[in-house]
Regions:
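P-loop NTPase motor core
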Residues: 99-159
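Conserved P-loop
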Residues: 2-99, 107
């Protein structure tokens, strides 16, 4: 490391729990201001307990589907991924933002996975095609780390 390098301390945190167990509430207690990327319903229930000037909210309503495949949702999913990625990058570059909150990481993973399948013209991915999905997810973590932002990602427990 060169003598001019600056290490910016930050927190990388995953909060996992059952629905309505306080995951988002805990995330909103991190250093302000926050950029919230909400893929989950229920943010409105929690957000009213906090000062609205402390956060920027980006919402991404998940399409209703009965399949793990992107059948008929390709363009919609790709547009959602592109919008999220652009807004996430902008938040990491905003010097005012201290914390990024992704609610939920599970939803982001599904968006990334389905968007990649749509890019390839497929409804789903084969095992060897997940490299780009993992790279995109890793990129979200790395971008926050390099920018010196706190990153909080919520997840639901799975059976």
């Amino acid at each position: 490391m060169s003598p001019t390098s600056k290490i910016v301390p930050n927190i990388m945190c995953s909060i996992t729990g059952n629905p309505k167990s306080g995951k988002t509430h805990l995330a909103l207690t991190f250093p302000k201001p926050l950029a919230i990327f909400s893929f989950d319903i229920g943010l409105e229930r929690v957000i009213r307990h906090f000062d609205p000037k402390d956060f920027t909210i980006h919402t991404y309503p998940m399409p209703i589907t009965t399949s793990s495949k992107s059948k008929g949702l390709g363009k919609e999913i790709q547009a959602m991924w592109s919008k999220f990625n652009d807004e996430y990058i902008a938040a990491t570059e905003d010097p005012e933002i201290k914390t990024l909150v992704v609610d939920t990481g599970t939803a982001v993973y599904e968006i990334v996975r389905l968007a990649k399948a749509a890019e390839l013209g497929n409804e789903s991915l084969l095992r060897f095609q997940y490299g780009d999905v993992y790279a995109r997810m890793r990129g979200l973590l790395q971008r926050a780390r390099v920018a010196g932002k706190n990153l909080v990602i919520t997840h639901y427990l799975k059976d």
